[in-house]
A protein has these predicted regions:
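RNase H-like DDE/DDD metal-dependent nuclease/strand-transfer catalytic core used by mobile genetic elements
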Residues: 50-96
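Extended, low-complexity cationic-aromatic segments
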Residues: 1-57, 153-156
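A short alpha/beta connector and helix-capping loop motif
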Residues: 1-16, 81-97, 116
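C-terminal anion-handling pockets and recognition modules
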Residues: 106-160
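RNase H-like two-metal-ion nuclease catalytic core shared by retroviral integrases
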Residues: 72-73, 80, 94-118
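Short, conserved catalytic/metal-binding motifs centered on acidic residues
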Residues: 29, 55, 71-75, 104, ...
Length: 160
């Protein structure tokens, strides 16, 4: 991860020349009341095959029986194979209304995870994975309860 901010003399742009193009990492996981579950990191942008693999190998086994899975409207979430696998396992899928990140408590968890991972300034793949693991573990049940409470408040209090 590279610095998000820099310094330069007044009136000049801060420029950082990277020696190489950094590897993109994709972090995926789920949340239920009281816990985060099924974390996985890929050293690339996630593909539809990765999404299905995560559903089959990680998510379904981590869910309690007859869970309701609420997803946002990311195109990959509509993958028929993944949706069928979830339904065959006895779970229900619901989709949020479009453009509603304020109603999605996991967005607050992602914010904390990314902030903590960036804050440790990892250099290299091993250190980045360790930073992500530590950040993931830092999301407490109390945090999660707060994220769900905030989501409910956002849903019922119009913003003027």
């Amino acid at each position: 991860m590279h610095p998000r901010y820099g310094y330069a003399p007044k009136g000049q742009r801060a420029v950082v020349k990277l020696k190489s193009r950094p590897t993109r990492y994709t972090l995926i996981g789920a949340m239920r009341i009281g816990s985060m579950l099924a974390p996985r990191v890929w050293p690339r942008a996630m593909t539809a095959d990765d999404w299905v693999r995560w559903i089959l190998e990680d998510l379904i086994s981590a869910l309690k029986p007859r869970s309701i899975i609420i997803m946002d409207n990311l195109n990959i979430h509509y993958n028929g194979y993944a949706l069928d696998a979830i339904k065959e396992a006895g779970h229900t899928v619901l989709f949020q209304s479009r453009y509603s990140p304020d109603f999605n408590p996991i967005e607050m968890a992602w914010s904390k995870i990314k902030t903590l991972a960036r804050g440790s300034r990892p250099r290299g793949a091993k250190l980045l994975r360790a930073a992500i693991t530590d950040a993931w573990s830092a999301v407490t049940p109390r945090d999660i309860d707060g994220y769900f409470s905030q989501t409910i408040e956002n849903a019922w209090q119009p913003k003027c």
